[in-house]
């Protein structure tokens, strides 16, 4: 406590195993820390330790039940009003729960990580919420994180258990395509068509197969720009 105010510190597992959120009952003020960031929850950062979508969602639901009238989140502007705060917290929890449930259901049918990534869908009524925009984490990153928690590093593709070096793979694919010029021509076409994901795959093979190719590096820079 501090003066007439009580600061209740609550533990949760979210971005880390030791996240803390704070409740000040006298002011009906909630500080969720990074458990709410006014965007898709940061539960899938590609270069961070394991994160816990299910427990994260549970913490958000606990917060929503408090009836806070002021919320000071770890990122973004304050939110005022009990109804607005409750909706924001429960929407975030629903997103996390939905992704985890879909991933587990698909894993239990024997799907590979690739299939899971592309088959999990965000509920339609959550897609356009201003507090769930994918401005930091893409929902596909969250899918990968749930897979890692329950399925480990193996993606379900047998050829990835003991793979050949990627440089060798790249040279084989470029040779099969008829050489690097053919590959770069196709990359440029894909770029112009707006198929940037596939363009990224092919240009990476080109650069890896011939790392000294200036045209390959130049096109790669354009694709990722």
Stretch-by-stretch model annotation:
Residues 65-69, 78-225:
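Accessory terminal helices/loops
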Residues 6-109:
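Metallo-beta-lactamase
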